[in-house]
Amino acid sequence: LIERSEIEAIFYSKKYEEIIEKIKYNDKNKLKHLISMDSDIHLEGIYSQKELIEKGKELVEAGNREFIDSKINPEEMGIMLFTSGTTSKSKVVALSHRNLVTNIMDLASVLDIDSNDRMLSFLPLHHVYECTVGMLLSMYVGAERSFCDGIRHIVENLNEYKITYAAFVPAIYESMYKNVKRTLEKEGRLEQVRKLMQEYKDKSMEEKKEVFKEIHNMFGGNIRTFVSGAAALDKGVIETFRNWGINLYQAYGLTETSPVIGIETKENSRVGSIGKALPHVNAKIEDANEEGIGELVVKGPSVMLGYYNDEEATKEVMTDGWFYTGDLAKIDEDGYI
């Protein structure tokens, strides 16, 4: 991966010291800078992150503005991400600064989220879903972000950090749903809650939240919005969460699209869909059958630059700026995908 990406610098933790020793500065890669995040001092051929930060502070205090005044070309590659490579050798997705910023700003414009929110990171940051929908979005809106201690501690962290917004994968929500159901069964209150859910089905989210306050407390008591992505989530789970008064929205996208293409929101929500395309995403269906189902094709400033150093692979999925997702979909008369 280091050779294919042609990177020149690596920030690494103690866990990867042995690997770094084996690969550093050889003829097969273009590495120029190795930065240890744990070492307090410079070692042979290796920088200390701590010392570099201190040296940078000294330069800024002395009037050096080289970094502060540096210009960023929005069309240049800002990040590269490796695909999973389940069908062939993994590809290197090249995303520009404009790709990422467009997706972040689009999300901020449609989601009910601001600087008063507290968000929880669970997925790895090299996963574009967590990187954009999680870390970068929270930085853009000024929200507080906490990092999960692990899958077994999700509920504990939701409570501890008073989380109001979180983006997880379907398996997490399915597990939450089962845990609530198991608790209610154990207490002999499952049927009672089901009747209440039916009774309050068409009530406001605030009314539901008050009635199902005990269930809300199982998730920390502060959650306003959950987002599910990376795979399809069972309709029944979505409907149940919403009947409890918890906004659970589906999102869809790919690494190549920075990643979000469509997402449900407070204003545009329909169970079974992934909402409508983001403001700067043009979406259409190619080769639709009689039911309107065909390949989802998208275009816009959040679509990747291409696959790094792989023009052939890029041409296979992109034509005249349109990216062919390889996924079947339909777009209804209201614009829901």
Which sequence ranges carry the predicted segments?
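Active-site loops of AMP-binding adenylate-forming
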Residues: 97, 233-235, 242-247, 254-272, ...
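Conserved ATP-binding/catalytic segment of the ANL
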Residues: 277, 284-286, 290-337
